[in-house]
UniProtKB/Swiss-Prot annotation:
Function summary: This protein is involved in the repair of mismatches in DNA. It is required for dam-dependent methyl-directed DNA mismatch repair. May act as a 'molecular matchmaker', a protein that promotes the formation of a stable complex between two or more DNA-binding proteins in an ATP-dependent manner without itself being part of a final effector complex.
InterPro entries: DNA_mismatch_repair_CS, DNA_mismatch_repair_MutL, DNA_mismatch_S5_2-like, HATPase_C_sf, MutL/Mlh/PMS, MutL/Mlh/Pms-like, MutL_C, MutL_C_dimsub
Family named by the database record: Belongs to the DNA mismatch repair MutL/HexB family.
GO terms for biological process, alphabetical: mismatch repair
Organism: Kosmotoga olearia (strain ATCC BAA-1733 / DSM 21960 / TBF 19.5.1)
Record carries keyword Cytoplasm: no
UniProt name for this protein: DNA mismatch repair protein MutL
Lineage: Bacteria, Thermotogati, Thermotogota, Thermotogae, Kosmotogales
HAMAP family attached to this UniProt entry: DNA_mis_repair
Gene Ontology cellular component annotations, sorted alphabetically: mismatch repair complex
Length: 602
C-alpha cells in the first residue's frame, strides 16, 4: 500500500480517540473551556451517565457568530498565538482540539451570546459538520449540548462503561473543579437530580467537606509553604485520619488537576513513619510555579505535567507536609508507650461488642501512640550520630536466610512431633511470638485474624446482621451515594442494612461481627473497594467485599490480646495452615535456630 494523506474526517476521529475517552473527558474539556472564557458560574447536566446527553453552560465572555463557526474547526483557539506561548501556558486549553474532536463523534448544539452584543448564534453539528444555524438571544455566555456521544463510531461506543459508572466518573471530574476553583459557582444535575448547587466560596476550606463529607475542619491542617519559587498551599489530615486508598489525595498544579504517582509519593514521604502501612492521608494541595518551569503538553488529557526540576518540587511537597505536621505538634515517627516486653501487664483481654470503643476506633487503634514534638525529632538525630560501634559485625546473610512461612506450608506432622508451640507473648501489640522445634515463629496478629474471619465468612451461607436501635443517617459524598444505590444488594449480603428515604440514606443494621463504632467506616471502605475495582461478576464482588469486611473486623495493631486469646489464634492459624491474609500479605515468618546460631557464631 502506498503512502497517502488521510482524509480530514479520519484525522478527526483519530484525534477524538485521544481526547474523548469517556463521557467524563467531554465534561472536562467543556468545563475547562468555560473557565478559560472567564466564567464565574458553570452548570453541568448529564443524562444516562452522559451517554445520551451532556450540557455545560457558563456565564463567560461568549463568542461572536463568526468565532463560533470557526471554533469547531481543528486547531483553532484563542489561547495561544505563537510557539513561545507554549512555554508559559496560563489557560486550561491551548490545542484547539476539544470542540472539533467532540463534535466529530457526536451530535452537538452550541449557543453563544458574546459580551456587549445584542445577538448571538446557535449552531447544530452532526459528525463534525454544521447542519443548522440560527440567531440566538439569551444570557451572556455559552451553552454546549452533546447528544449521542460516539454515535458514528459504534466500535468505540461499546467500550463506554455502564451509565452508572460513566456518571460516577463525571461526578469525580466535577468534584475536582469544585476544589480547584473555589471562587467559581458550580451547579451539577444528574438525571434530573440536583447534586451540587454551590455559590462562589472565599476559601477552599468551605469546599472540602462538600467533596469529602466525612471530614470536618478539626481533621484538617493548613499547608502554607513557599520555597525556591514554588508555593504550596492547601490542607492535609492528621496521620490518624486516613483511608486505604489514594482517592483522598488531590494535587493541582497551577490550578490544573494532575495525576502523577511521584507527587503522591512526596506527600506520603512527608508523613515519615506516622502512617500505618497501607493507609493514605487526605491531602488537597495546590502547587503554584512559574509556567515556564512546567510542560503541560505531554498527555492527551493534560493529566500529567513535566517539571524542569522535578526533585525540587518533590522536596518542596515533602517539606511542606512535614513542616505542617511539626507545627501542629504531630510526630512523623511512630513511637508508642507500651509495657516493657515480658511484664505481667503485657496481656489484657479485648473487650467485646459495643464496649470495645477504643480499639475499634480507627483513629486510636492504628498504633500511632504518643505524639513527639519537634525537639524530640532533633534528639533522635543526635542519638543516631552516637551509635556505639560493635567489635563483631552481624552476618548479613541472617536476613537473607529468614524463612517465611509464605514460602512453605506447615506440615501437620511437625505439630504432632513437637506438640503445641510454646507461646512467649505478644510483642509491640502486633506480633505473636512462639517457639517451635525449628525456631522462633512470629505471627502478625491482624493478618492472621483477618484470614481466619475471611474463611469463616466464606463458609457461612449468610452473614448475620444485627438491627440498630437507632438508625444512623449516612453522610456520603456523591460517588459513594450513587454506588450504594447501584450495589445495595451486594452490600446487604455483607450484613449491612440500608434504607433510602428520598435523598436521605440510613444505616439500619450492621454485620454482627462489627461494633457500631466502626460500622460506618467499614461501609465507606467497602464502597471504595467497589469503586476502585470496578468488579461486575457477583462472585468476585462478594469475595472482594468479604476480604474488606474481614480486615475491618479483625484485631488491629494496638489491640492487646490476653495470653489465652493469643494462644487460640496461634492454634487456629496452624490448624488451618494459613499462609496469607486475604489481600496477599504473609501472616507469619520463621527464624530458624541454625540462622540464629550462625548469627552468633555458635
Amino acid at each position: 500500500m502506498k503512502i497517502h494523506e488521510l482524509p480530514q474526517e479520519v484525522i478527526l476521529k483519530i484525534a477524538a480517540g485521544e481526547v474523548v475517552t469517556g463521557c467524563f473527558s467531554v465534561v472536562k474539556e467543556l468545563v475547562e473551556n468555560a473557565l478559560d472564557a472567564e466564567a464565574t458560574t458553570v452548570e453541568v447536566e448529564i443524562k444516562a451517565g452522559g451517554k445520551e446527553y451532556i450540557r455545560v453552560s457558563d456565564n463567560g465572555i461568549g463568542m461572536l457568530p463568526e468565532e463560533l463557526k470557526m471554533a469547531i474547526k481543528p486547531h483553532t483557539t484563542s489561547k495561544i498565538q505563537c510557539i513561545e506561548d507554549l512555554e508559559r501556558i496560563l489557560t486550561y486549553g491551548f490545542r484547539g482540539e476539544a470542540l472539533s474532536t467532540i463534535s466529530s463523534v457526536s451530535r452537538m448544539r452550541i449557543s453563544s451570546m458574546p459580551d456587549n452584543a445584542d445577538l448571538g448564534l446557535t449552531i447544530e453539528i452532526s459528525g463534525g459538520k454544521i447542519v443548522r444555524e440560527k440567531s440566538y438571544i439569551g444570557p451572556k455566555g455559552t451553552t454546549v449540548e452533546v447528544y449521542d456521544l460516539l454515535f458514528n463510531t459504534p466500535a468505540r461506543r461499546k467500550f463506554l462503561k455502564s451509565q452508572r459508572v460513566e456518571g460516577r466518573m463525571v461526578t469525580e471530574i466535577v468534584q475536582r473543579f469544585i476544589l480547584a476553583i473555589p471562587d467559581a459557582g458550580f451547579k451539577y444535575i444528574r438525571d434530573g437530580e440536583l447534586i451540587y448547587d454551590l455559590t462562589p466560596a472565599e476559601r477552599i476550606l468551605e469546599r472540602i467537606p462538600v467533596v469529602f463529607p466525612e471530614l470536618s475542619t478539626t481533621d484538617l491542617l493548613e499547608v502554607k509553604e513557599e520555597t525556591s519559587g514554588i508555593s504550596i498551599t492547601g490542607y492535609i489530615t492528621f496521620p490518624e485520619r486516613t483511608r486505604f486508598n489514594r482517592l483522598g489525595e488531590m494535587v493541582f498544579v497551577n490550578g490544573r488537576y494532575v495525576r502523577q504517582p511521584e507527587l503522591n509519593y512526596a506527600i506520603e514521604k512527608g508523613y515519615g513513619e506516622s502512617l500505618e502501612k497501607g493507609r493514605f492521608p487526605f491531602a488537597i494541595l495546590f502547587i503554584s510555579v512559574n509556567p515556564e518551569m512546567i510542560d503541560v503538553n505531554i498527555h492527551p488529557q493534560k493529566l500529567e505535567v513535566r517539571f524542569s526540576n522535578p526533585s525540587l518540587v518533590f522536596d518542596a511537597i515533602k517539606r511542606a507536609v512535614r513542616n505542617t505536621l511539626r507545627t501542629s505538634g504531630t510526630s512523623i515517627l511512630r513511637i508508642e508507650k507500651r509495657p516493657f516486653p515480658g511484664s505481667s501487664t503485657n496481656y489484657s483481654g479485648i473487650q467485646q461488642d459495643t464496649k470495645k470503643q477504643e480499639s475499634d476506633n480507627p483513629e486510636k487503634a492504628r498504633g500511632y501512640g504518643t505524639h513527639l514534638r519537634e525537639t524530640h525529632w532533633e534528639q533522635r538525630d543526635h542519638f543516631e550520630k552516637r551509635k556505639v560501634p560493635l567489635h563483631y559485625q552481624p552476618d548479613n546473610e541472617l536476613l537473607l536466610n529468614i524463612e517465611r512461612t509464605a514460602s512453605r506450608r506447615f506440615e501437620k506432622t511437625e505439630a504432632k512431633e513437637t506438640g503445641e508451640p510454646r507461646l512467649f507473648g505478644v510483642f509491640g501489640e502486633r506480633y505473636i511470638l512462639a517457639e517451635t522445634k525449628d525456631g522462633l515463629l512470629i505471627v502478625d496478629q491482624h493478618a492472621a485474624h483477618e484470614r481466619l474471619i475471611y474463611e469463616k465468612l466464606k463458609k457461612a451461607a449468610k452473614i448475620q446482621s444485627q438491627k440498630l436501635l437507632s438508625p444512623i443517617r449516612l453522610t456520603l459524598e456523591d460517588s459513594r451515594k450513587s454506588l450504594l444505590r447501584e450495589k445495595k444488594n451486594d452490600v446487604e449480603k455483607l450484613g449491612f442494612q440500608i434504607s433510602f428515604e428520598g435523598d436521605r440514606i440510613f444505616l439500619t443494621g450492621i454485620p454482627s461481627i462489627l461494633s457500631e463504632s466502626v460500622a460506618v467506616n467499614a461501609l465507606n471502605e467497602v464502597l471504595d473497594e467497589l469503586r476502585l475495582e470496578g468488579l461486575e461478576e457477583p462472585e468476585k464482588i462478594f469475595d472482594h467485599l468479604l476480604s474488606t469486611l474481614a480486615c475491618k473486623s479483625a484485631i488491629k495493631t494496638g489491640d492487646r490480646l490476653s495470653e489465652s486469646e493469643a494462644k487460640e489464634l496461634l492454634e487456629k492459624l496452624l490448624e488451618e495452615e494459613i499462609l496469607f491474609c486475604p489481600h496477599g500479605r504473609p501472616v507469619s515468618m520463621l527464624i530458624r535456630f541454625k540462622d540464629l546460631d550462625r548469627h552468633f557464631s555458635r
